[in-house]
Amino acid sequence: MSNELPAVICLVGPTGAGKTAAALHLAERFAGTVINADSRQVYRDFPIITAQPTAEEQAQCPHRLYGFLETEARMSAGVWGDHATAAIDEALAQGRLPLLVGGTGMYVRALLDGIAAIPAIPRDIHVRWQERCAAEGPQRLHAMLCDIDAEYAARIHPNDRQRVTRALEVHEHTGRTFSEWHRSAMPAPRYRALRIGFAATLDALTPRLAHRIDLMLAAGALDEARRARVHCDDPSAPGWSGIGCAETYAHLVGSLDYEAMRHVWLHNTRAYAKRQLTWFRADTRLTWYAPDDVEGIALGVASFLRGGA
């Protein structure tokens, strides 16, 4: 890829791997702007539950695309890409280094590699699948998706109503799977990207994830969920589908007791981290670092900015 393209640094990896701390270090060292690339951290009502950077962290350098979306609003790779492109171009115009930080690999891939031009889905198809999901539950529809598109189904949570129904709608309307559409996307490079992956094993992550959930609960995750219900009390809303959001909602309405909520939250977080690791390990363009090797990461970024690999 031409060195004349503007440089973008991508910090990706599983949830809880330490991406935020590394991003802050790089932002200070290279005058960076941190741009969210996590599909859950866009929601305004859930800063604690989705582990958004704290106010103190965000005060250290410019942050973009955190907590700007209402709970009932939908986000897609294409819409996020438009927002991210604007944020990247803003940073570049200010002479700052764009740092894309997050665990939603599909978003980063769509931005950097191009996105499939999937036709608009007719409203009747969309409504039918939404009604079916409400009646049968997302897990049953996810099982259907496994038969249709096992590759994509393996990358999303069985309770992710938005992505499960979207994939089924696309298949019904176009006759092609989501995976087929993604593979057909034409590359449209606008940036020269260094893709940094955070190497972590699931066994090493699990105790960190459990501790992080306990910290979230101690910091007021349940109060946060209570306030979110005032704004939107529809558990099928996109914002509530996130891990941690769905479990706290279930606890607040009496479907899960406290310990069950915590157990399910950790189980789902661990399963999500496993899917993220599978996704990112399949991308041979990533350069891998230990999560705490901030100096090594900084040296790699400096080399890249000088025109290295």
Curated annotation (Swiss-Prot):
Transmembrane segments: none
Pfam family, one: IPPT
Site for Interaction with substrate tRNA, residues: T104, R128
Region annotated Interaction with substrate tRNA, chain positions: 38-41, 162-166
Binding site for ATP: G13, P14, T15, G16, A17, G18, K19, T20
Catalytic activity line of the entry: adenosine(37) in tRNA + dimethylallyl diphosphate = N(6)-dimethylallyladenosine(37) in tRNA + diphosphate
SUPFAM superfamilies (UniProt xref): P-loop containing nucleoside triphosphate hydrolases
Cofactor(s) needed: Mg(2+)
Keyword Nucleotide-binding: yes
Keyword field contains ATP-binding: yes
Binding site for substrate: T15, G16, A17, G18, K19, T20
Biological process per Gene Ontology, one example term: tRNA modification
Entry's Gene Ontology molecular function annotations: ATP binding; tRNA dimethylallyltransferase activity
Keywords, alphabetical: ATP-binding, Magnesium, Nucleotide-binding, Transferase, tRNA processing
Functional note: Catalyzes the transfer of a dimethylallyl group onto the adenine at position 37 in tRNAs that read codons beginning with uridine, leading to the formation of N6-(dimethylallyl)adenosine (i(6)A).
Subunit-level organization: Monomer.
PANTHER family: TRNA DIMETHYLALLYLTRANSFERASE
Protein name as catalogued: tRNA dimethylallyltransferase
Native species: Nitratidesulfovibrio vulgaris (strain ATCC 29579 / DSM 644 / CCUG 34227 / NCIMB 8303 / VKM B-1760 / Hildenborough)
Lineage: Bacteria, Pseudomonadati, Thermodesulfobacteriota, Desulfovibrionia, Desulfovibrionales
Primary gene name: miaA
